[in-house]
């Protein structure tokens, strides 16, 4: 599930397909025939060696210096053999009629980053899915759609909205390429005029682009269109006395401001802490700001 696999083999040919496991998604297949090959260390994804093998092959688990740690004989009826990240291995045919197929897998949250080079799934989304089960979900301000696409891949019923028609078109194109049932459309968040109810509404690093005077109405609209027992997740930059924001954002939260908007909700997480943006400064360093991260559950 990466756009450019770091494994090195003598022969390789990738046929991309989606193959889902419970917690992992498959990115590509590699087919080998005729001679031995060595797979160097790979990181961040799982490699499953399918038993689509003509005749037999011997698999060696290796140390970095080539020392053999274990040997396995694979035949067409051997089932699936799994090699985990940070492992080296070598496959050698035991006769001339040899073919093997490899499948590469990674965590679903890394799928679109590794396969398509998109921004990685936001850490707050990764954490939220440990609490919020698959449900009807709204991504407010989806941008390129990396969070919405991950959630759709993970089984959530996702609608993604953004003010940019180009961003929406890009998300829909990616969803179609990956055969995901994700909805996306253009929407002005400042209008605070949602027309559907959801179990989970989130806005990650979006409020900084919104009209400051519309924020109370936007949050009230989010809350009104969250079903009882549903969740809101907001991550946004802050401007506080101890950590002033020098970026030209249209809006930043003050200390404890977001908490007050959700005084009647159950705050499952509320954190005001220094963090890094994906954007960089003139020296190429990630911009450091104070952020508020909140996951709140609506009563009911």
Swiss-Prot record:
Lipid bilayer topology: Single-pass membrane protein
GO biological process: response to tellurium ion
Pfam families, A to Z: TehB
Highest taxon of source: Bacteria
Gene Ontology MF annotations: S-adenosylmethionine-dependent methyltransferase activity
Cell location: Cell membrane
Cited function: Induces agglutination of neuraminidase-treated erythrocytes.
Family matches, as NCBIfam families: PRK11207.1 (NF008405), PRK12335.1 (NF008992), tehB (TIGR00477)
Protein name as annotated: Hemagglutinin 1
Species of origin: Eikenella corrodens
């Amino acid at each position: 599930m990466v756009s450019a696999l770091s494994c090195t083999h003598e022969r390789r040919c990738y046929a991309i397909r989606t193959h889902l496991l419970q917690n992992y998604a498959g990115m590509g297949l590699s087919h080998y025939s005729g001679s031995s090959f060595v797979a160097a260390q790979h990181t961040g994804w799982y490699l499953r060696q399918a038993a689509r093998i003509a005749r037999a092959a011997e698999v060696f688990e290796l140390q970095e210096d080539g020392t053999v740690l274990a040997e396995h004989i694979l035949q067409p009826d051997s089932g699936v053999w799994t090699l985990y990240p940070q492992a080296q291995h070598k496959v050698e045919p035991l006769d001339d009629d040899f073919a093997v197929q490899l499948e590469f897998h990674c965590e679903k949250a890394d799928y679109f980053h590794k396969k398509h080079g998109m921004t990685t799934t936001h850490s707050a989304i990764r954490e939220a899915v440990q609490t919020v089960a698959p449900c009807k979900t709204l991504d407010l301000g989806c941008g390129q759609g990396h969070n919405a696409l991950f959630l759709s891949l993970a089984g959530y019923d996702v609608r993604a909205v953004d003010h940019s028609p180009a961003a929406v078109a890009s998300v829909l194109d990616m969803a179609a390429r990956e055969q995901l049932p994700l909805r996306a459309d253009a929407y002005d968040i400042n209008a605070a005029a949602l027309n559907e109810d959801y179990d989970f509404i989130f806005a990650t690093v979006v409020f900084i682009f919104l009209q400051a005077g519309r924020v109370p109405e936007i949050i009230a609209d989010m809350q009104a269109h969250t079903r009882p027992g549903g969740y809101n997740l907001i991550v946004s930059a802050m401007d506080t006395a101890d950590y002033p924001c020098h970026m030209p954002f249209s809006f930043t939260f003050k200390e404890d401001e977001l908490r007050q908007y959700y005084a009647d909700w159950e705050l499952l997480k509320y954190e005001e802490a220094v963090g890094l943006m994906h954007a960089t400064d003139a020296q190429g360093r990630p911009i450091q700001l104070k952020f508020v991260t909140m996951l709140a559950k609506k009563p009911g």
